[in-house]
């Protein structure tokens, strides 16, 4: 055997061992290594946004995109499932559990079909929570990159965002504690950074929904929001009247919609309307004027503090 063949054999063997090791780690449910996120560029403010695609699950829901569109005036479409990871959205499509399509101002369309065409200015994705399980078992960064690459084939100028969410209020590690810790450790360091490292995704920016929810919850519990006293005031109720520990109510949807708008439109949300409609046209529960103004200020401050959004802090002045 000559030297080239010998080296080739060694490389093949090494690759096989590496693949086996990766497979073993995945079977064991180990988290992938955390990566440093590349420095963010500051995005230019959009000239206009005509259409937005939302890909996710019930923490996107029907009403939050509808509120966002009321702020921005854009059309939107969404593909949702029950706690669906990005991988399952790709591999199962309309067969995924809880499959739903929604739209306003534009026709509804399955995600892969819609994004392959040049019809959307913005794609917002989110990942299944528990986020650690998405990373262990559903290869979040690979599928984030896959969706981003598809969207850029349809529209090379599309802006792509990952919507950071939250875990259950009764999470054993603490709800606020998880939001504080998971942003850098998981959403940025284990989802966005390795997705971008594939070289297929282009830049992916952050919509800090969890951070905004945490800021508003802290303000409520500090007595800084008239009419609210706890984080539970942002969450829905179950059919028997108990607290739904993961799904937001109209007030929570308003917080998240403000956050999306501030990032996507690169404008301070201070002064936006606080009386909104749900997706079905019914009147949403709203903050009072004083509380709404404070919530808008909190969201503005969250977005301004995070360069991962692509928003220059000066854009949040006001």
Which residue ranges define each predicted feature?
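N-terminal export leaders
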Residues: 2-12
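Core hydrophobic alpha-helical transmembrane segments of single-pass membrane proteins
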Residues: 11-19
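Conserved SGNH/GDSL esterase-like catalytic core that processes O-acyl groups on lipids
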Residues: 55, 61-147
């Amino acid at each position: 055997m000559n030297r080239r063949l010998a080296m080739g054999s060694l490389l093949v063997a090494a690759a096989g061992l590496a693949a086996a090791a990766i497979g073993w780690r995945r079977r064991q449910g180990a988290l992938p290594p955390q990566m440093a996120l590349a420095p963010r560029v500051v995005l230019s403010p959009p000239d206009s946004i005509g259409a937005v695609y939302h890909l996710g699950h019930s923490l996107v829901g029907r009403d939050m995109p509808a509120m966002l569109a009321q702020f921005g005036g854009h059309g939107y479409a969404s593909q949702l499932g029950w706690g669906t990871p990005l991988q399952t959205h790709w591999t199962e499509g309309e067969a995924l559990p809880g499959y739903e399509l929604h739209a306003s101002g534009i026709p509804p369309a399955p995600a892969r079909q819609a994004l392959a065409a040049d019809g959307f200015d913005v794609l917002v994705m989110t990942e299944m929570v528990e986020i650690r399980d998405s990373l262990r078992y559903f290869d979040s960064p690979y599928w984030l990159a896959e969706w981003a690459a598809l969207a850029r084939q349809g529209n090379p100028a599309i802006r792509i965002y990952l919507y950071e969410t939250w875990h259950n209020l009764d999470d054993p590690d603490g709800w606020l504690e998880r939001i504080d810790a998971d942003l850098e450790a998981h959403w940025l360091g284990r989802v966005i950074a390795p997705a971008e490292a594939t070289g297929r995704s282009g830049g992916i920016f952050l919509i800090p929904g969890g951070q905004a929810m945490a800021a508003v919850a802290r303000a409520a519990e500090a007595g800084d929001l008239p009419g609210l006293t706890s984080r539970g005031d942002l969450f829905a109720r179950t059919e028997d009247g108990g607290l739904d520990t993961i799904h937001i109510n109209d007030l929570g949807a308003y917080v998240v919609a403000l956050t999306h708008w501030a990032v996507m439109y690169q404008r301070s949300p201070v002064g936006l309307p606080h009386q909104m409609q749900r997706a079905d046209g019914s009147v949403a529960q709203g903050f009072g004027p004083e509380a709404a103004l404070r919530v808008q200020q909190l969201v503005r401050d969250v977005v301004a503090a995070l360069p991962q959004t692509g928003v220059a802090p000066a854009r949040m002045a006001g």
